[in-house]
Design a protein with these regions (language model features):
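Generic hydrophobic-segment detector
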Residues: 1-2, 57
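Short N-proximal segments of mature Sec-exported proteins
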Residues: 2-51
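Compact alpha-helical subdomains of small soluble proteins
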Residues: 40-106
Length: 106
């Protein structure tokens, strides 16, 4: 169930980004949160099929946590890394990952 994994990972990524945006009062946080909810809805629709395929439903929580941790780490590197090159690289990597998710639902 590659789709379920992608949807869960993207939900986690967007949740981390929306959390950060909300913390700094970024006006895009609401839009990001709506995208997160969209991925959660897609994942919820697939979960019965994931279970039927013999995949533990808890896997979706792990996939979501992986996506959240991935973006949280990149956000940390982007903001706090002493080397500007590493910070730019983290921002670019994060943008690519978020863009990958956004393109799935547009």
């Amino acid at each position: 169930m590659e789709q379920a994994q992608a949807f869960a990972t993207c939900a986690g990524r967007l949740q981390a980004l929306a959390t950060r945006q909300g913390a700094v009062h970024d006006p895009q946080s609401s839009e990001t949160r709506q995208k997160q909810y969209g991925f959660e809805d897609l994942l919820d629709a697939l979960l019965p099929h994931v279970s039927d395929a013999g995949i533990d439903a808890r896997a979706a929580k792990r996939w979501r946590a992986y996506g959240w941790t991935e973006i949280a780490g990149l956000l940390s590197r982007a903001q706090y890394h002493e080397d500007d090159r590493h910070a730019r690289s983290a921002r670019a990597d994060m943008a690519r990952r978020i863009d990958t998710c956004t393109r799935m639902i547009l």
